[in-house]
Amino acid sequence: MSNVVIVGTQWGDEGKGKIVDLLTEQADMVVRFQGGHNAGHTLVVDGKKYILHLIPSGIIRPGKQCAIGNGVVLDPAALLAEMAKLAEVGVAISPENLKIADRTNLILPYHNALDQAREKKKGEEKKIGTTGRGIGPCYEDKSARRGIRLVDLYNPALFEEKLRENLDLVNFLLKNYYHEEGFQLADIRDDYLRMGDQLAPYCEDLAPWLEQAQAEGKNILFEGAQGALLDVDFGTYPFVTSSTTNASGACSGSGVAPGKLDYVLGIVKAYTTRVGSGPFPTELECADGQYLAKKGHEFGATTGRPRRCGWFDAVVVRHSARVSGLNGICITKLDVMDGMSEVRLCTGYRIDGKETAYVPADTAKLDRVEPIYETMPGWRESTVGCKNWQDLPAAAQAYLNRLVQVVGVPISILSTGPDRSETLIVQNPFHA
């Protein structure tokens, strides 16, 4: 039995979906433990593309059990739409292969409205750059103990009471502070009770279910969303998401004890990208950045927004390794850098004339850091589909070796293309 956690080490979009899909071959179960439908995982299997937002990537493989943990915030309408889309392409979903934690907090229509109204009021200069899908306001309600959970839909009187109390506050804010329309209780109540009936067969007390699976010796893969620099505590606050994106979130977001985790794999893009607002020390606003964006198809799977691109930042990935306790890293999208005459990696920062190897908590400081770069020769040869280390161009090998040196965590997996077959496995996390 092994419990493996997969986390992003940058600002999300590192390519976690493909690696989860790859490792699901050895897993019996895949558990999504945080985030919502603001995150998107893109998989390419046998030339067919799948984009998932809530359902764990393991759902594509027959015979695997998947679960949405209590750390996720769930929009029932978005989940049902995703299930329907998967059914259209032949992926059958049933209570046999998908469970949803009964403690999962629900995103309601007013969460979306609050999210969008807040961004609008902040304006272009100060907005966070959220997806506007209600993630932050839902987590806010959860922390304030006014959240509505999946289990509440099966007690209609309690659900209506909670909804009424919340709407008293929400409608006051929307109408009087944001000058937006409010909501009618009956409309939300009826829609959510109907969707609750549809999801009832999937509802599960997840912690005992996972405990039983561990007792039976099953391999469990825990799938994170976003990345460590979007973590609500250790990210570039306030330009972050509202959940725990590091490895500790796998425990609080599923009910599995910390001592049960065996291996933490960090997914690392060979360069760096970010969607939305916030500091980005190695951002490239030049031809190299445009090259990476175009060749890497750097557009968000959820929003379609173009991603900001930059050189690899070892300070950021070391920070991620520290807070998640990484055992190994998986490098993705190395092939995107094929054809560049030279490549650079950031090994440290200079702030107000002083060098540091750490990500400062002060966002204003991070905004003005000067990256300390090492420049290395690029490679003209293609790395696409390389499955042996010796097949990689010498310059690509040198780049990866230096990357490992400055990060301090060994490479477990190297991805050289979008398909699951385009992968070089150095150490399988389930066999570590």
From Swiss-Prot:
Its EC number is 6.3.4.4. The active site is at residues 13, 41. Pfam families: Adenylsucc_synt. IMP binds at residues 13-16, 38-41, 131, 145, 226, 241, 305. It is found in: Cytoplasm. The keyword Metal-binding applies. Keywords: Cytoplasm, GTP-binding, Ligase, Magnesium, Metal-binding, Nucleotide-binding, Purine biosynthesis. GO terms for cellular component: cytoplasm. Belongs to the adenylosuccinate synthetase family. Plays an important role in the de novo pathway of purine nucleotide biosynthesis. Catalyzes the first committed step in the biosynthesis of AMP from IMP. This is Adenylosuccinate synthetase. The gene is purA.
